[in-house]
């Protein structure tokens, strides 16, 4: 103790009229039997705004947003016709309490029971390796990611599989889907030589490794294609 007294004043503002939007894209499945089943990729589009200076959010989560859009564009423009439906979503309001992802599960565009897997991408834009957080019971879903990495991407890969049955931190979008019984694999990067400032003005594009983002697009695209084609997704 320094035996000192301090007075602290906080000035805050609440804007209940604020509106955010989820952004959704879909490639409809072509197989009469499998098309109702859905493979998803998602991540949050928002950052923390002005606090009071601009917070760029290049890694968190500009990186994940770009990867999802890249995978969606690659598959949509390739002429590929998936058997299962592929759904891509950018959530609003993750930083203010998972608002966008919670809205989606409360007002789903597809039946929640039809979603066979969600790949949640957050802060995958630095370092050299790709990490996957996965609950133990979703080892079969994780195997598609590992196969895509081993065959096409060939990045150092690690997973939390076997550590526990908690899919991810409860303050990330994947947790909202996990609580509904949907298999979730949360993808991120590891191995950065320089720590990227978290929720800080220093989270800028100059720190981003575009090579690993390119490989992440390839990983997500390939995994979704593979899962779309199998006769049955084993969970």
Please name every model-derived segment.
Residues 10-14, 52-61, 90, 128-138, ...:
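Second-shell loop/turn segments in exported
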Residues 74-81, 112, 160, 178, ...:
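C-terminal soluble interaction/assembly domains
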Residues 1-57, 73, 77-83:
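Soluble metallo-hydrolase cores and metallopeptidase-like ectodomains found primarily
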Residues 23-26, 38-42, 87-90, 116-121, ...:
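Structural recognition of the beta-strand scaffold that forms the well-ordered cores
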Residues 58-71:
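Active-site alpha-helical elements of protease catalytic centers
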Residues 34, 47-52, 127-129, 193-198:
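Short acidic/His/Gly/Ser-rich catalytic and metal-binding motifs that mark active-site loops
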Residues 73, 189, 194-235:
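His/Asp/Glu-rich mid-to-C-terminal helical/loop segments that flank catalytic regions of hydrolases
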Residues 91-195, 232:
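Metal-dependent peptidase/peptidase-like ectodomains
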């Amino acid at each position: 103790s320094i035996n000192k007294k301090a007075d602290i004043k906080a000035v805050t503002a609440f804007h209940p009229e604020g509106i955010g939007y989820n952004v959704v894209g879909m490639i409809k499945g072509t197989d009469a039997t499998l098309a109702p089943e859905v493979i998803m990729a998602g991540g949050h589009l928002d950052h923390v705004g002005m606090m009071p200076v601009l917070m760029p959010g290049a890694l968190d989560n500009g990186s994940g947003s770009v990867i999802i859009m890249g995978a969606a564009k690659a598959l949509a423009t390739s002429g590929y016709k998936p058997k299962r439906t592929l759904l891509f979503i950018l959530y609003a309001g993750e930083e203010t309490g998972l608002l966008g992802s919670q809205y989606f599960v409360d007002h789903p565009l597809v039946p929640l029971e039809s979603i066979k897997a969600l790949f949640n991408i957050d802060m995958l834009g630095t370092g050299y390796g790709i990490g996957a957080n996965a609950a133990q019971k979703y080892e079969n879903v994780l195997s598609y990611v590992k196969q895509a990495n081993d065959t096409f991407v060939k990045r150092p890969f690690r997973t939390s599989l076997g550590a526990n049955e908690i899919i991810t931190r409860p303050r990330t979008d994947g947790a909202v889907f996990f609580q509904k019984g949907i298999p979730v694999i949360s993808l991120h990067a590891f191995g950065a030589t320089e720590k990227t400032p978290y929720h800080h003005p220093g989270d800028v594009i100059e720190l981003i490794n575009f090579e690993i983002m390119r490989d992440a697009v390839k990983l997500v695209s390939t995994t979704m294609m593979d899962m779309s084609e199998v006769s049955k997704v084993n969970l």
